[in-house]
């Protein structure tokens, strides 16, 4: 097979569009793009095209937006493209075995973690949430399971102490395309070596929800601090003060300890709002009150000191 592959790309959000952009700058030929149907977005709820569709149209690439691949028509449409390979990145749709078998070389997926550590929908967030030292991307040959296919390439990077899901997303959006292009070179040259996953090492990275992001002050301070970073930019760690929901944008673990009940404010000054937890003290450094942008603790205390007096019990 020649070094240039005929590729069908399947993806939807900005993360996927960055991988498509890398493909468009490579020696490979993107013959078609699959993406989710246009969805209502914004306050006006007008139909909005996914980022992948926008990029494909800019390059005059045919775009397909089936609701599913259940129909024979959708499957035949893909078969008629005569692709060597399908590259799938955050597509948001399950692919049946018939689709996985259609391209000559099958389908590969770029997954936002080091497999098999985190399979599922929220691997970036869960890696921070769990306190992992590193994360990365895994490119795998897709099978019918959930992120269970043989691994073709892994690229890693450290998780820094200040990384949030937002910052890690940006890093992986740069790492992923590089790894993909390297992997495609191996596939085109017949040098790709599939490695089976060890199922015993697998965890499921379940989706996040707003209820999970509510701070439980009985948890360890270190765990709460990781949650603050993992749940940024969504759903945002939060708690209640003076019957208002307060979002936490930045925090750190204090060196000091406290014997006060979990959730008690033990210190409040320009260095932060210090809150006793189940183990250790958490320092709140940047907060967002309803109707306002995120603010430093000093600005918060200048305007709402009564909400955060020492001895106040946060819930």
Curated annotation (Swiss-Prot):
Pfam families: Formyl_trans_C, Formyl_trans_N. The keyword DNA-binding does not apply. It catalyses: L-methionyl-tRNA(fMet) + (6R)-10-formyltetrahydrofolate = N-formyl-L-methionyl-tRNA(fMet) + (6S)-5,6,7,8-tetrahydrofolate + H(+). InterPro entries: Fmt, Formyl_trans_C, Formyl_trans_C_sf, Formyl_transf_N, Formyl_transf_N_sf, Formyl_transferase-like_C_sf, GART_AS, Met-tRNA-FMT_C. The keyword Protein biosynthesis applies. Keywords: Protein biosynthesis, Transferase. (6S)-5,6,7,8-tetrahydrofolate binds at residues 113-116. One of its GO terms (cellular component) is cytosol. Its EC number is 2.1.2.9. It is an enzyme of class 2 (transferase). Belongs to the Fmt family. Attaches a formyl group to the free amino group of methionyl-tRNA(fMet). The formyl group appears to play a dual role in the initiator identity of N-formylmethionyl-tRNA by promoting its recognition by IF2 and preventing the misappropriation of this tRNA by the elongation apparatus. This is Methionyl-tRNA formyltransferase. It comes from Vibrio parahaemolyticus serotype O3:K6 (strain RIMD 2210633).
């Amino acid at each position: 097979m020649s070094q240039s592959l005929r590729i069908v790309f399947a993806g939807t959000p900005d993360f996927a569009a960055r991988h498509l952009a890398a493909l468009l700058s490579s020696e490979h030929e993107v013959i078609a793009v699959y993406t989710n149907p246009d969805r209502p977005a914004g306050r006006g709820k007008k139909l909005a095209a996914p980022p992948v569709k926008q990029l494909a149209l800019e390059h005059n690439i045919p775009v397909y937006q089936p609701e599913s691949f259940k129909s024979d028509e959708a499957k035949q449409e893909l078969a008629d493209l005569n692709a060597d390979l399908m590259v799938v990145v955050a597509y948001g749709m399950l692919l049946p075995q018939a689709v996985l078998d259609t391209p000559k070389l099958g389908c590969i997926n770029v997954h936002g973690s080091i497999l098999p550590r985190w399979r599922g929908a929220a691997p970036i967030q869960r890696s921070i949430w769990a306190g992992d030292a590193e994360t990365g991307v895994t490119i795998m040959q897709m099978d019918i399971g959930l992120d269970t296919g043989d691994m073709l390439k892994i690229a890693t990077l450290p998780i820094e102490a200040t990384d949030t899901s937002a910052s890690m997303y940006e890093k992986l959006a740069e790492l992923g395309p590089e790894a993909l292009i390297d992997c495609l070179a191996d596939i085109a040259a017949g040098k790709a070596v599939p490695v089976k996953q060890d199922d015993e090492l697998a965890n499921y990275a379940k989706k996040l929800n707003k209820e999970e992001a509510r701070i439980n002050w009985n948890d360890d301070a270190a765990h709460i601090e990781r949650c603050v970073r993992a749940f940024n930019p969504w759903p945002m760690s939060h708690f209640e003060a003076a019957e208002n929901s307060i979002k936490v944008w930045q925090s750190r673990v204090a060196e000091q300890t406290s014997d006060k009940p979990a959730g008690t404010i033990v210190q409040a000054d320009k260095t932060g709002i210090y809150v006793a937890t189940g183990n250790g003290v958490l320092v709140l450094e940047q907060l967002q009150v309803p109707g306002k942008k995120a603010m430093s603790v000093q600005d918060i205390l200048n305007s709402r000191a009564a909400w955060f007096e020492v001895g106040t019990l946060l819930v």
